[in-house]
Structures are given as C-alpha cells and as structure tokens.
C-alpha cells in the first residue's frame, strides 16, 4: 500500500513513505489466467503437449502475462509505480504468489524485468518439480484428448472438520498409501477444496456415500499437486529456488513490501530475497490456502495505517478479488475502495509500436557454409586452396554449355554472339544425387543445375552446422526459412526449353529454388528468391538478417546461385560493355581492367541469432554485426557505381553496429575489374575506412583489401556469398590470400597515397591471426548493375571454452547414408579424417555424429573407446558395406518391447554410474525414494549409490524397492531418450515396474505394493528357510529326474529353463539329483522362495491392502502376463487378486511369450530392451523367439553402465528405433564440441540436357517428329460431358437402351485424387488397394443410373450386390503422372426381372481391355421386405452380442479400443485411413466379435455409398481373420475375394452409430477358407447384412507378391511384382493363367527384353546329375522344391509331374517367393504350368542359372 501522489512523474521512479493519511494500493496476483482467449490457448497447449511438464509452461506464461501487463499499465498511464514504498502490499494465490514476491522486492518499475525473470525461473522449476512428483502418483494419459483430469475439487457448504474426519476414516479403512491420500488443500468461508490424484478423486466421489451426495466442482488444476505437506519437504523447496541472483546484484532488491501468507494471513518475514522465495515456494508446496485469513490480514493492515482510500490492482475480476473487495467495503463506511484492472490498458491503447527495432539488435552468427566454385572447388577447403595459391581460374567456355566456336565473335559483328570466349566454370555441374533428394531421373534432368546444387550445398551447410530438425527452439521447422539470390534462368530458357515437359516450370522458375529446399527439409518458414542483379546473394543475406532481427525466423539458409548455359546473356553483357575480351578472371584494380569475366558458383550459409547459436552449441564461423542496402540514385546512369552512396551505406552500417571505421581491418571489395567500378569503390572505401585527414590509421591498424573476383570471376548472383565465404575462410585459416587481379600495374585512378592511409593490397599470402586485444572485423561490399549497394560488417566468431567433462569412456560412432555407394564413401571419409586427426576427442566425435547429424537408412554403428579401435572397425565395415541392408523407412520403426527383470538379477549394492553421472536418472531415483520414505519404508538409495560394499546384504524391503525403482527410473531414462515400449512384460517382481510403465499402477502405488509385500515377507516368513533353484532343463525333464522329491515350479522361463522353489534342505537334495542327471543348476541369491508355499502366510493380507490401497488402471499398452500366459488389454484383469496370484503362482514366461507371438503382439521384428540391473530375460526371449534381431540390456553387472547403454543404443539405432541423441548428450553438452567433419559423400550421376545447335524457333526440339507417337489413354477419350460423375465413376463412355434392356460402360482413373485417396485409405503392404467397398460404391452408382434410365419414375431404389467375386485384385500404381484406368460394365436384358450383371476390366495402355478381374450380380429389391426377413434372426444375434459382452467383463474375451484395434489391424495387414476407422471398440473371442461403429462426419468427395462407410460397418470380419489369436497371423494373412450378398435397408449416415456382429466359420471343403455373415444393427434392429463374406488364408510370404504396385519395379517399389493380382490366384478361375515373369539374373536370357519362351514342340533334354555343381542355383532350387513338397530330393526324378506331388497354384507361388528370397531368382508361379515336369524345370534352370 502506498501514496500515489506526484502524478506526472516518470512511472519508473520509486517513492518514499508519505506524510498524512495514505492512499492504500494493494495488488492481487491471481493463480488463474485472465478469462480472455489466452486461457483457451493455454488449455489447447496442454492438449497438444506430448511431453514435458505442462504446469511449468502454465506458470511461466502466467507470470509473464502479469509482469507484462503491470509494466504496460504503468507505462501507458500517468500513475507512479507504488511498490517502492514500504506501505504498499501485495497478495497472491498459487503461482501468482511467486509473481507477487518478485514485485514485493522490486524498488522501481525499471528493476521489475530482472526480478520478473527470477520469478519466471522459479515458476518454471516449480512446475517441473510438481509435474515430476505428480506423474509418479498418476501418470498423465497422453492418448486421450479433451479436457485433462483435475487434481482438485471444491465442495461448497460443508465444514472442513467434517471433510477431514471423513477422509481420515476412508484412508484408515482402505490403508491408503500416504502419498496417495486425498487431502484438504484450501479453505474459504463457504467451501472446502480437496486435492489428490485424479483417479482417486473420481473414485472418492463414486464410492463414498458422504462425498457422492455432495455437490462439487472440478477446478482447472491440471498440472499436479500443490499444498501437500505430506508429500513435499524442505529439500524440494531448496531444489526449486536454489540461490536468487537478486541477492547478488548491485540493485538493492529486498523484501520491503508486505506480502501476505495465504495460509496464515500474516506477512512473510524474510531476511533476503532468496529466503522470501523459499517461504513462498514452501507455502505453495506444503501449506493449505486460507483466503479468509488473507482478507483479515489486509483489513488489519488498513486499520494500522488509518487509510481512507484503498486501490486494489487486479488482473480481471475473480472470486478471491470479489471477496476481498466486499470485505473492504463492508469493513469501514469511511473507506473509499476502488478497483483498477491492469489489463484494461490493452483495450484502451490505440498506439502501436512502429518502425525499425533500432541498432541494438542481436548479432547474427554464421554457423555453416558450403559451396561449389569454379575449377574443381567442390568444397570450402578446395576453394581455399585455390585462393591461397592466388589462382586465376578462367578458361574457355566448355562444350557442355554451348559451342564457343559458333557463338563467339571477337569483332562483335555477328548477331547474338559473345565478344569473349572465356568464363570461370564449375566442373560437371550436372552431377547430382537424385535418389537422395527424392527426385526421379527425369525430374533431376529437367531441374536447373544451379537449383540442384543449391539444394546440395544447403544440405552440406546444414550438416556442417550440426543441424537436426526440431533439436532446439531455433531449429523448429516452422521457424526456418530460405533466402537465395538468383539473377538468371539459363537452363530453363535454353536447355529444357528445347523440349518442354512436366518439370519445365517447377524445375526452372526461380521461386522453386529456395522453395524446393524448404520442401525437402520440411521448413515451414518463408522462402525467397531475390534478384538484385550482381548483388543478389548479399542483398538476400541482408534480407535474411532482417528476418532474423524481426523475429520472423530463428534459422535461415541463405546464399546465391549461378550456372551459365545461355549464350544470349554473354552476348547481351558483351554488347553492354560489361565483359572483358581478354583471357583473365577479373583484372580487378589493374590499369588495363576492361570488364569482368562471367562465372558459375553456388554458395550456401546457415545463420542464427548469436545467442541462439551459442545456446545450440554451434560452431560460429563469423558474426554479422550489421547489414544494409541502399541505391545509387544520384549516379550518372543506372549501371554506374556511385562512391558517395556507397560511403553513406558504410557509415550507416558502422553506426548501427557501433563500430569505429578503424575497427575494420579487412574490406572485401566488389572489384569487378571495370575502370569506373573499381575507382568509385576505392574512393568510397578510402574516404570512410582510411581517411587521410584528421585521424589516421596507425601502424597497428592496417587495412587490407581484396576481391575474390580476381580468382574465380564475377559470379553475378552468387558474387556476394562467394566473397562472404572467402572472409569466413580467412577467419578460419587466419590468413589473407594474395590478390590475383593486378596483372600489370595498379589502376592509375586510385589514390596515390594508399601506403599513407595504411591500405594494403596483399600480393602474397598474409597472416591475419586472432589476437586478444583486437577482434578481426571485415566489411564485405557488393553492388549491382541495377544500382543497388549492399554491405555487411562481420567479425570473427567467439572462441568457446568447454565447461566440465564427459565421464563416459565408451562412445557410439554412427555413420549412415541413403545408398550403399554413399555409405562406403562416408566411411572412407571418416577414416581419412581420423588419419589426419588422430587426437580427436571420441566424445566430441560421437556427439557430432549422433546428436548433430541426420541418420539415413543405410547404417553402421561402432561402439568404441579409442581411435585405433575405431579405425580398425571402420575398415572392417568398409569391406562389408555392400552386405548392409537398409532400414525400410516406409514400414516405420519396429515395435519396442520392455522386459523387466525379476529379483534373480539383484545384487548387494549396485553402485550405478548412471546414478552418479546422470542427473536425470539420479533425480528419478531420489524422487522415488522420497515416495518410499513417505510411505514409511526405509531408503533404498544405499543399495544403489555404492555407499555399502557390493557384497553387503540389505534388508529384503530395501533390495526389492531398489530393484523396482531402478527399473522404473531406467524406463523413464529410456523414455527421455525417446525410446518407449509398445508392449511390456515383467518377470516376477519386475512385473510391478512393467505395470507402472503400462499405466496400470502409478509409481507411488507400485512402491506401496512392493514395499508392503516385502515387509509382510520379513514379518511372516523366515528368510533363508526356502530357496530357489534355476535348472537348465525343461519341466518334463525336471519331473522325470526329480521323481518324488518335494518342490514347486516357480518359473517356466524357456524350453530348457525352469526355476524351482522348496525348503532349503529339499532344494539342496534336488540340486544334487538334477546335477547327477546332467542338468546344470544355479541357486538364486534371494531371501525367500517366491511363487511357492512359503508366501502363503502373506497372501490374504497382501490382497487386502492391494484392494483398498491401490488403484488399478486400464493399461495404455499391451501387457504380456506371465501369470496368465496371455496378453492383457482390458482394465478388468489386473487387480488385487492378480497381484496375489502373481506372488504365489508360477511365472510362465514361455507361455506368455508364445501367446503374444500367436496374436502378433510380438514377432521377429520386435526390438527388446531388458530393464533391470543385469540381463536375465534376454536369454529366455531369444529362446522363445529365436529369430529376433535385437534383445539388449540396459545395465550389465560388472560393466560400466555407459558401455552397456551405448551398445544397446547402437543396436537400437541399427534397428531403426529413433533415439533422442540430443537428450542423451544434454547433461554433458557444455563439455562437448561440434566437430567440422567431412560432409556427405554423394552418389552423383550426371543429369544434363545439352543445348543443341544454333536454334532460334525450334531450339533443337524433336517434338513435331514425335507428334504421331501414341498418346496415353484418357478417361473416356474424346467424348461429350458425362451424364454421371462421382469420386469412383468418372465418365460414361458408352450406353445403349432398348425398351427394358440396357447397357452402361463407365471408365474411372485410379490416379484421380478422390479415387486415389480411397484406395490409399485401405493400405496393404504400403500400397493403395481398391477394396470391395469401393467396388460396391461403383455398383450402387451405375446400378442406380441404369435403373433410372430404364424406369425413370421410380424413386425408391434399393440394391443387393450379390455373388461378388474378385479374381484379380486392383492395386494403385506408384506413378501418378499416367492414368490407371478401369472399365466397369453393367447390363440387364430386362430391368423388370430386377437383375443386372456387372463386370470389371483393367484398361490396357493401347486402350484395349484386359480379362475381367471381377464380376457381380445386382438385384433390385425392397427395403421393407429385407427388414421383415431379418426380424426372426435379430434376437439370436443380439444374444450372441450380450454373451460376448459378458465374456469381456470376465476377462475371457478381449476388448479393444479404436486405436488399439486399428493399430493391430495395421500391424498385421491393413492400415486404414482415419475416415475408414469407424469401429470405436471391438469385443473379440476366437472367431466371433462385435464392434460399436461410429461413421465419420467427413465425406470428402462425391459418393453414392461412401466406401469408408461400408468398410467401417463390414470390416469386422477382416479384423477377426487378421488379428484373432484363433488364426495364425504370424505366418498367414487373410483376404476376401467377395461375398454372397450385400444390402442395406437403411442408408448409412455420416456420424451415425451402428453395431456390427460376425462369426467366421471354416468351410468343410477347405480349412483355409472361412465364411461369415456380418449383421449391421442400428437401435437394436438389423438394417444391413453382408451375407457369406469369404476370407482365404495365405502364407505371409506371399504378401509382397499379391500386394505390390503394378509399376513398383519402375518406381522404386520394394519388389517388382510377378503378378498384377492383389487377390491370390488360388481363388481365380481355372482359365485365369498368370503371365510368367522371366527371372531377373545377371545373365542375358531372363529379362523382359530378351525373355526366352518355353519350347512348344519339345521338352528340354534331361541333364545328367553328374554335370551339376552341388552349390549351383539348380541344386539349391530343387532342394527347396523338395522341402516345400515334403519330399526327399531323390524323389524329384525328371519324369515326375509337379501336379502329382502337390505343387498346386498356391504352393507354386510360395515356392516362387522362396526362390526370390533365398536364391535371388525371380520367377512367376505359372512357371510350373509352363514346365510341368521336374526335368523340364531342371533343364530350364541349368540353361539360365547353371
């Protein structure tokens, strides 16, 4: 409270205590956002936040808003800042109390930003702490959307004593763990607020009679628990606050203003700012809010001051403010009370800040660069070599540009010729790695080479900058832009214009250059192509700096490009007197300078604001201090330079950068080598940087000048960035290269006193070392023929010192590429680097290659501890690089499974390096230990931190809690690295950690269960009386050997791994007997015999405390249960009885894994990580799933934790699991440096369209010669407009009607957007497949059209699609540039019959039709008849639905959520687009299921019955056949060729809800074929049916063969399909023969071009067996055939017919696929029809394969 007199004085001052009755000012800082739209934004922010503590963001934003509005209020009003006075007061709630504390210690408004920053720091750390603690009580469910769960409920009209009594009774009765207790967190006169974990709050109001009958409101408290004295301690407070910097500043920050405690209403009594913040944070964490006491305290303060006027400052109105103001107004009738809203000024102010940001802008750091310069300068090192040698690299115009002999005329008399034959050119500008940049050869060839090389150099510059997308805030993809200068379009105008094609515009127009860079890297920031003629690239860089200064971007890639191919520009510049006729680059500053020499060049740099670059740990090559552009408006002509304009710009740049001209020690001049240009520029430079009058440069202030054009010519649009890269290299090399432009003598127009001015032209390489007393600062100047001038001031980058050290001694060195050629090149480049850098830090190398590089599909990863070993391994990898298989990106990363180790892996004291050296891991352990101690358990840290000897025996409760919490902390550590499980399994005690990670148990509850169980064991069981014995034998072997000896089976871990429990003496006897029988035995170091009768005394009590003290939640990912031997998905299975049984009953690890395999939850692609102190489960897993590729531990006993982790990280990386390397290195990043490593080794090929001849009009194209070439078919050809057109029916191409008969033919193009999207909405094997629902929509459309044409008066048309049979499926091709046409015909002989026939065809390239691939019969019917016919069936089907529901509640049937159902569907076969995903939940039991369906509201196209509607209600059958554990989905997949009938009596409506039911039954004729009837219900009535839907089982081996795009071989598909069909030929008619695909081998015959047909007249001659090499393809092929047919090879005699030994159409396809996979021989299954006898095939194989 303060006096507010003295109006009109600056608001930034402070006040003394006034004399007389004061006006009292009280500021209230709320704990809620103002009710403006920001509130909505922050809630949305919570919804979208995928990781990290939301409450820290919430708190930071709230503080920032309050401080900003407080400052804005006082700056825009005439009010004085009142809080410098000791009579002012502040109050606040929650985070608002932190903001209030900052205001209370601030002497003036000018000092508030510093105090505010301190408050923001504390608010952020407080939020992180609260989130971490709260997540261990109840993890936030990220899978849900909408309003998050509240941690606090307010109950009105109830006594706090009554509430507390009720809570105490509940906690006592239910034995609630202390951290999980519900508690009173706030009191007011009218209400009580209770807080706790959201699930427990919901349970309280659901189960307690007292609370259930009360009104309550969930508060918007989403971040976690505060005001919880039973959870937080003083150490938490100190962890948040640490020491405030405000106690150490020169400004006197002190707690001089009264701040009211929200728990006592009394002012905080603090001795320092740190102490005040500690009290405030302690108040928020441990004390309940009692706002009535604050109101009372305020009233007492007003009475104490005898105040007559009170002003209450608020951030909008709120309930606490209302109560306070009401109390003030009723307390004293003489007290005048006013309220001032600190947000009101925002709405009253009309002024907006305009104009530039001023000179105090951020410096701009250049953090990466790359170039392609003339004469082989393919990187910056080669460019420097060229410069330091002083080379002039001009040459004659090369033949790949144009014919210099015909296009050059030194006399200038011939029209359109060049006066000079010279230029400076990039070698082989057509070289490009098209595959790397996802460009087809055709697109690459038609794309301007300068744009291609801009893309390449941008990548290299980013690579050298250590760029990884979204690694930091400055590398957020939405905040990165590209800026490139380009002043010509030669390639488009000349080369591609000869034959204009698809990419003429996107490959040649300037805007696409930077745009393509943005698109490739997925930058969402701006992209600019800027043309200012010769200054384009430097002006572009200046524009990029402006973008950074204005905050439009945080990172920019900028540069320039120029590749010369057009003779017109040479002719034009020559005629304009710009070019030199003589053989030189540019004779810059020479007396005979007569013009410039044109040049190629590409340059790219990466820039950030300096503070961002330093925060990102970047290498800073140079720092831009200022940049500007102006125009020579007063020049004598537009092309003539103007010294005064240039000088004006220099002074402006120096002024803005706060530089003295003498600070500049080098000027890189434009220096084109023209008399006028050189003289004008020298005049401006000498005038500003080296004047002769007044102050002069001393001998210690030399100014060197240079011009790179004398070396590499004038690159025009690239000239500026070329000069800038030269200066950056000079900083790096600490040298100035020699000037090469003066061939004779110096320009006579230059000042004669250059030496007096201390201006130096370096004729030799000159040292330019870094010095401690003076920074090296350079100016780069560039001007334009169009009149512009651009100048940049740049200084050397700062030297950065490492802080701390990296304790890790083992490091991962990964190398990757997009092709094998590049992988080998990258390996060789790293070997070469290590040869010249033998002392490189491996820590820096690992950091640079992991956290600061992109990772591509071809990968190598080496774990190493020294450089010599690394080089040896690299050479080994180089030799084997050809055998590396790439990661298939399209398939996504493989699933990850966490296996949590049981107690058998425990050992005395772990002494983990992770605990000592990883702050994140240690913090997790300490937080979990705090929970354990808070529940009354002893600290388990001594079992982890090494404070006891390794052999020390801790109490069981300590050992078991240490194991649990180590595993939880390890899982969290992996999660922090971005590695999260898709499925979990826990072995014995490890299951508790697994259940926590799966979301079933909170960390607090897991600790409670394990701790209670351990205490019960200690109390009720005798330690050491029983033992556990691991035996390397199967259970059957143990039973046979042990005979009648007493024991119990504790664990079945594998086929040959069994663990037994028994009394100690019995175990000893058992071990002796088993070892005598030859079985290895190991006694486990455990105190008790788990899973045995020894645990019986604790079971009842343990189940009781588990039931009342713990909340079991639904798992958020599959849990493989070793107790049940199945996978758990639902929320009913795991409960108190489950953990009881898990304590007593056997661990059947083997059966659990087998069950998970059976339903494809795990398979050979699953990546396993063992979570525990030593790997135990890995062996069991490898035994159960022998084909798995990765099963790695987190920690290994006796091995440094980092070494184990690095090895596992390497395995994950090679498996394609994304790792957050940034997070892995974060704790040590200040000790690490980004190395300037070799850039990517490109797999370059030449893409170049040669300019031909001397053309004018035709320009050498052959378009008209090829005019008669066949055109690609178009939908419908040249036909009039179609009478119908939908998303799947595009054109009617023919129709005939004759009375009641009619035929309609339509064509559709799969490549049309809606059709294409519909196909890719049903994706199989990463291909778009035209599902039967799409065919159905076509039939409904054309069927309605046919009926309307023949019976135009009928409106109510209902159709039954019957006998649909798809004999050859339809897969969308990859190439969308050409049509993919189908034709569908519908015909009826008499519409009155109510039937029509439908046939589908593929349209061939020549416009003809292929054989029909599908047929159906259409029946027209009446909906009411259908509805009546279904009534008798309804109750039977509903009865089955209810039975399934009952089975699901009992945990017998499986219930799947929408995400889980479609996730499994996608994993096993079909990846549906979102609008196809109508099933909201599925209950599945065996081959029977029902689904609740909600159709999408989004139609997105023109449909008769949207395919995604049909699929949503019908594909439950496919879900059963491809997900159910009753089907072997690991080895087979199932697809449908059609159905008997599909009809809907009511239309399927967007957004409507339905229920589908189906039971699939194997047919008697063929066990591999299944039939079922799908019923569709709405409001318990059957409204639709798909009767007789058929599914056929096929080996998964054939998936590629059946579901590959028809053009996959041409367009980079994974496999070239041998057949067009997506539906396997086993369902085809006998007449449908698949055309053979000739095998692909190195020998000539087996190719499409020179295929050898099977002889028609005679069979191949039999071949003697002796002539066959046993290692030959033929021998291996015949062995493979024999194995598949279950025969001995000797039975395959030449006269044996394949048909007689069971090689049918299906087996032939399987054999063909195995030929391809095993032998590399690609054939069609029909080969066995062409060569029906063994001898025929053997002879064919020998002929072509040997």
Swiss-Prot record:
PROSITE patterns named in the record: CARRIER, KS3_1, KS3_2, PKS_MFAS_DH
Q: Which residue stretches belong to region Product template (PT) domain?
A: 1286-1605
Q: Which UniProt keywords apply?
A: Multifunctional enzyme, Phosphopantetheine, Phosphoprotein, Transferase
Q: Which residues carry this modification: O-(pantetheine 4'-phosphoryl)serine?
A: 1705
Pathway involvement?
Answer: Secondary metabolite biosynthesis
* InterPro entries xref list: Ac_transferase_dom_sf (IPR001227), ACP-like_sf (IPR036736), Acyl_transferase_dom (IPR014043), Acyl_Trfase/lysoPLipase (IPR016035), Ketoacyl_synth_AS (IPR018201), Ketoacyl_synth_C (IPR014031), Ketoacyl_synth_N (IPR014030), Malonyl_transacylase_ACP-bd (IPR016036)
Write down the superkingdom of origin.
Eukaryota
Q: Positions of the region N-terminal acylcarrier protein transacylase domain (SAT)?
A: 4-227
Molecular function terms, GO-annotated? 3-oxoacyl-[acyl-carrier-protein] synthase activity; fatty acid synthase activity; phosphopantetheine binding
Q: Which residues form the PKS/mFAS DH domain?
A: 1290-1600
Q: What residue spans carry the region label Malonyl-CoA:ACP transacylase (MAT) domain?
A: 898-1218
Q: Which reaction does it catalyse?
A: holo-[ACP] + 8 malonyl-CoA + 8 H(+) = atrochrysone carboxyl-[ACP] + 8 CO2 + 8 CoA + 2 H2O
Induction profile: The cluster is expressed in rice fermentation medium. Expression is correlated with the production of pestheic acid. Three regulators are located in the cluster (ptaR1, ptaR2 and ptaR3), suggesting that the production of pestheic acid is controlled by a complex regulatory mechanism.
Database matches in SUPFAM superfamilies: ACP-like, FabD/lysophospholipase-like, Probable ACP-binding domain of malonyl-CoA ACP transacylase, Thiolase-like
| PANTHER family (UniProt xref) | FATTY ACID SYNTHASE, SI:DKEY-61P9.11
Q: What does this protein do?
A: Non-reducing polyketide synthase; part of the gene cluster that mediates the biosynthesis of pestheic acid, a diphenyl ether which is a biosynthetic precursor of the unique chloropupukeananes. The biosynthesis initiates from condensation of acetate and malonate units catalyzed by the non-reducing PKS ptaA. As the ptaA protein is TE/CLC domain-deficient, hydrolysis and Claisen cyclization of the polyketide could be catalyzed by ptaB containing a beta-lactamase domain.
- Identify this protein by name: Non-reducing polyketide synthase ptaA
Organism expressing this protein natively? Pestalotiopsis fici (strain W106-1 / CGMCC3.15140)
**Gene name of the record:** ptaA
């Amino acid at each position: 409270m303060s006096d507010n007199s003295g109006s009109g004085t600056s608001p930034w001052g402070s006040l003394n205590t006034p004399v007389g009755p004061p006006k009292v000012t009280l500021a209230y800082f709320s704990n809620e956002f103002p009710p403006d739209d920001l509130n909505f934004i922050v809630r949305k922010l919570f919804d979208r936040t995928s990781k990290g503590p939301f409450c820290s963001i919430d708190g930071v934003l709230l503080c920032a808003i309050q401080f900003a509005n407080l400052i804005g209020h006082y700056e825009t009003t005439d009010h004085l800042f009142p809080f410098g006075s000791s009579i002012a007061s502040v109050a606040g709630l929650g985070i608002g109390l932190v903001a209030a504390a900052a205001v209370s210690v601030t002497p003036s408004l000018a000092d508030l930003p510093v105090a505010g920053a301190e408050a923001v720091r504390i608010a952020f750390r407080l939020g992180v702490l609260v989130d971490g603690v709260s997540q261990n009580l109840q993890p936030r469910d990220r899978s849900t959307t909408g309003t998050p769960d509240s941690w606090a409920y307010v109950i009105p009209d109830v006594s706090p004593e009554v509430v507390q009594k009720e809570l105490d009774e509940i906690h006592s009765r239910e034995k609630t763990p202390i951290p999980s207790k519900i508690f009173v967190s706030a009191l007011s006169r009218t209400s009580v607020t209770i807080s706790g974990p959201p699930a427990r709050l919901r349970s309280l109001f659901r189960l307690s009679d007292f609370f259930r009958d009360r009104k309550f409101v969930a508060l918007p408290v989403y971040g976690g628990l505060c005001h919880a004295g039973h959870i937080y301690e003083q150490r938490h407070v100190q962890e948040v606050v640490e020491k405030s910097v405000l106690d150490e500043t020169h400004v006197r920050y002190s707690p001089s203003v009264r701040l009211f405690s929200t728990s006592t209403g009394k002012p905080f009594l603090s001795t320092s700012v740190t102490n005040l913040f500690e009290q405030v944070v302690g108040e928020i964490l441990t004390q309940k809010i009692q706002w009535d006491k604050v109101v009372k305290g305020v009233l007492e303060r007003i009475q104490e001051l005898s105040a007559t006027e009170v002003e209450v400052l608020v951030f909008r109105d709120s309930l606490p403010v209302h109560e306070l103001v009401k109390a003030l107004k009723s307390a004293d009738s003489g007290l005048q009370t006013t309220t001032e809203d600190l947000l009101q000024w925002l709405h009253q102010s009309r002024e907006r800040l305009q104009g530039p940001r001023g000179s105090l802008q951020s410096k701009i750091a250049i953090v990466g660069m790359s170039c392609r310069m003339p004469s082989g300068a393919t990187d910056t090192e080669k460019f420097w070599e060229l410069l330091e040698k002083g080379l002039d690299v001009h040459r004659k115009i090369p033949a790949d540009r144009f014919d210099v002999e015909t296009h050059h005329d030194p006399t200038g008399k011939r029209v359109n010729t060049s006066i000079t034959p010279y230029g400076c050119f990039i070698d082989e500008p057509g070289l490009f790695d098209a595959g790397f940049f996802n460009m087809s050869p055709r697109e690459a060839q038609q794309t301007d080479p300068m744009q291609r090389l801009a893309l390449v150099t941008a990548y290299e510059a980013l690579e050298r900058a250590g760029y990884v997308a979204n690694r930091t805030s400055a590398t957020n993809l939405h905040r990165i832009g590209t800026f490139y200068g380009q002043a010509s379009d030669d390639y488009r105008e000349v080369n591609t214009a000869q034959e204009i094609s698809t990419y003429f515009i996107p490959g040649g127009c300037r805007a696409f250059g930077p745009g393509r860079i943005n698109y490739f890297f997925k930058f969402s920031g701006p992209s600019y192509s800027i043309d200012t003629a010769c200054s384009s690239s430097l002006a572009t860089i200046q524009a990029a700096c402006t973008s950074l200064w204005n905050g439009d971007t945080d990172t920019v890639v900028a540069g320039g490009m120029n590749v010369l191919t057009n003779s017109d520009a040479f002719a034009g510049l020559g005629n304009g007197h710009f070019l030199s006729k003589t053989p030189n680059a540019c004779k810059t500053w020479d007396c005979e300078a007569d013009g410039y020499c044109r040049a190629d060049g590409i340059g790219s740099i990466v820039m950030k604001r300096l503070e961002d670059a330093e925060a990102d740990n970047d290498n800073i090559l140079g720092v831009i201090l200022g940049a500007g552009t102006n125009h020579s408006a007063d020049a004598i002509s537009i092309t003539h330079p103007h010294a005064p304009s240039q000088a004006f710009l220099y002074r402006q740049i120096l002024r803005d950068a706060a530089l003295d001209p003498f600070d500049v020690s080098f000027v890189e001049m434009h220096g084109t080598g023209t008399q006028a240009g050189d003289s004008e520029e020298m005049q401006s430079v000498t005038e500003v940087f080296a004047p002769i009058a007044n102050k002069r440069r001393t001998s210690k202030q030399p100014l060197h000048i240079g011009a790179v054009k004398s070396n590499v010519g004038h690159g025009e649009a690239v000239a500026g960035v070329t000069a800038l890269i030269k200066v950056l290299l000079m900083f790096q090399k600490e040298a100035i290269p020699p000037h090469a432009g003066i061939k004779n003598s110096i320009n006579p127009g230059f000042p004669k006193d250059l030496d007096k001015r201390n201006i130096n032209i370096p004729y030799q390489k000159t040292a330019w070392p870094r010095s401690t007393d003076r920074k090296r600062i350079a100016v780069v100047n560039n001007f334009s023929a169009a009149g512009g001038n651009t100048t940049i001031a740049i200084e050397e980058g700062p030297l950065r010192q490492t802080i701390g050290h990296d304790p890790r001694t083992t490091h991962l060195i990964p190398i990757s590429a997009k092709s094998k050629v590049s992988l080998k090149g990258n390996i060789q480049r790293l070997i070469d680097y290590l040869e010249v850098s033998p002392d490189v830090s491996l820590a820096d190398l690992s950091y640079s290659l992991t956290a600061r590089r992109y990772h591509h599909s071809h990968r190598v990863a080496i774990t190493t501890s020294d450089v010599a070993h690394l080089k040896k391994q690299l050479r080994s990898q180089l030799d084997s690089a050809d055998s590396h298989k790439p990661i298939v990106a399209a398939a996504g990363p493989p699933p990850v499974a966490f296996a949590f180790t049981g107690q058998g892996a425990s050992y005395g004291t772990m002494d983990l390096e992770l605990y000592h050296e990883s702050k994140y891991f240690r913090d997790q352990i300490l937080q979990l230990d705090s929970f354990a101690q808070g529940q009354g358990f002893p600290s388990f840290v001594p079992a982890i931190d090494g404070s006891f000897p390794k052999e020390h025996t801790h109490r069981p409760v300590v050992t078991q809690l240490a194991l649990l919490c180590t595993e939880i902390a390890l899982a969290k550590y992996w999660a922090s690295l971005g590695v999260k499980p898709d499925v979990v399994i826990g072995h014995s005690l490890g299951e508790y950690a697994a259940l926590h990670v799966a979301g079933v148990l909170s960390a607090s509850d897991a600790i409670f269960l394990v701790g209670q169980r351990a205490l019960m064991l200690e109390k009720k069981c005798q330690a050491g009386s029983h033992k556990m014995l691991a035996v390397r034998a199967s259970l059957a072997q143990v039973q046979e050997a042990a005979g009648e000896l007493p024991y119990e089976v504790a664990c079945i871990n594998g086929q040959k791994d069994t663990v037994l429990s028994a009394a100690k003496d019995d175990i000893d006897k058992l071990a002796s007997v088993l070892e005598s029988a030859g079985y290895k035995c190991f006694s486990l170091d455990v105190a008790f015999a788990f899973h045995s009768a020894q645990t019986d005394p604790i079971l009842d009590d343990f189940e009781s405390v588990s039931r009342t003290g713990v909340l079991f939640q639904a798992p958020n990912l599959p849990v493989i249960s070793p107790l049940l031997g199945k996978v758990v998905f639902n929320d009913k299975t795991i409960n108190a009885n489950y953990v009881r049984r898990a304590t007593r009953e056997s661990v059947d690890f083997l059966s659990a894994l087998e069950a998970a395999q059976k339903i494809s939850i795990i398979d050979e692609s699953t990546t396993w990580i063992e979570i525990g102190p030593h790997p135990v489960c890995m062996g069991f897993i490898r035994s159960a799933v022998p084909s798995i590729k990765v099963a790695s531990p987190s920690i290994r006993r006796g091995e440094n934790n980092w070494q184990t982790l690095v090895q596992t990280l390497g395995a994950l990386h090679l498996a394609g699991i994304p790792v957050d390397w940034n997070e892995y290195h974060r704790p040590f990043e200040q000790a690490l440096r980004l190395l300037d490593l070799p850039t990517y080794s490109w797999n370059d090929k030449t893409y170049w369209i040669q300019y031909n001849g001397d053309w004018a009009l035709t320009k050498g194209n052959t378009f008209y010669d090829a005019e008669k070439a066949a055109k690609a078919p178009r939908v419908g050809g040249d036909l009039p407009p179609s009478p119908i057109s939908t998303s799947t029916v595009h054109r009617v191409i023919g129709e005939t009607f004759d009375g009641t008969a009619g035929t309609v033919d339509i064509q559709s193009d799969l490549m049309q957007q809606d059709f294409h999207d519909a196909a890719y909405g049903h994706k199989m094997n990463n291909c778009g497949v035209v599902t039967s629902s799409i065919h159905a929509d076509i039939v409904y459309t054309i069927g309605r059209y046919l009926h309307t044409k023949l019976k135009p008066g009928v409106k109510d048309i209902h159709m039954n699609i019957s006998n649909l049979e798809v004999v050859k499926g339809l897969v969308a091709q990859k190439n969308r540039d050409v049509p993919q046409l189908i034709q569908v015909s519908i015909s009826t002989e008499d519409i009155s019959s109510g039937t029509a026939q439908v046939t589908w065809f593929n349209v061939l390239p020549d416009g003809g039709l292929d054989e029909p691939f599908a047929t159906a019969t259409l029946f027209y019917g009446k909906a009411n008849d259908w509805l009546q016919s279904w009534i008798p069936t309804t109750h039977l089907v509903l009865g089955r639905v209810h039975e399934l529901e009952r089975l699901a509640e009992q945990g017998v049937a499986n219930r799947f959520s929408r995400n889980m159902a479609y996730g499994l569907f996608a994993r096993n076969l079909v990846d549906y687009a979102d609008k196809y995903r109508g099933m909201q939940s599925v209950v599945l039991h065996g081959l029977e299921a029902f689904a609740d369906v909600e159709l999408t509201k989004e139609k997105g196209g023109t449909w008769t019955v949207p395919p995604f509607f049909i699929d949503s209600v019908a594909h439950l059958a496919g879900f059963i056949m491809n997900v159910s554990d009753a089907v072997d989905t690991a080895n087979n997949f199932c697809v449908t060729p059609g159905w008997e009938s599909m009809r809907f009596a009511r239309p399927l409506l967007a957004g409507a809800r339905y229920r589908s039911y189906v039971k699939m039954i194997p047919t008697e004729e063929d066990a591999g074929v299944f039939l079922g009837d799908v019923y569709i219900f709405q409001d318990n009535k059957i409204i639709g049916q798909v009767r007789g839907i058929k599914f056929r089982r096929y080996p998964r081996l054939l998936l590629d063969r059946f579901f590959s795009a028809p053009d996959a071989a041409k367009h980079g598909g994974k496999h070239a399909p041998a057949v067009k069909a997506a539906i396997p030929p086993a369902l085809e008619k006998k007449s449908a023969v698949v055309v053979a695909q000739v095998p692909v081998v190195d020998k000539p015959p087996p190719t499409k071009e020179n295929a050898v047909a099977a002889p028609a007249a005679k069979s191949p001659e039999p071949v003697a067996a002796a002539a066959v090499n046993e290692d030959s393809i033929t021998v291996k092929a015949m062995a493979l055939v024999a194995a598949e047919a279950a025969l001995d090879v000797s039975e395959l005699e030449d006269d044996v017919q394949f048909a007689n030994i069971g090689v049918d159409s299906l087996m032939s396809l399987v054999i063909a696929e195995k030929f391809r996979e095993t032998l590399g021989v690609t054939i069609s299954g029909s080969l066995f029809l062409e060569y029906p006898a063994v001898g025929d095939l053997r002879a064919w194989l020998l002929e072509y394969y040997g």
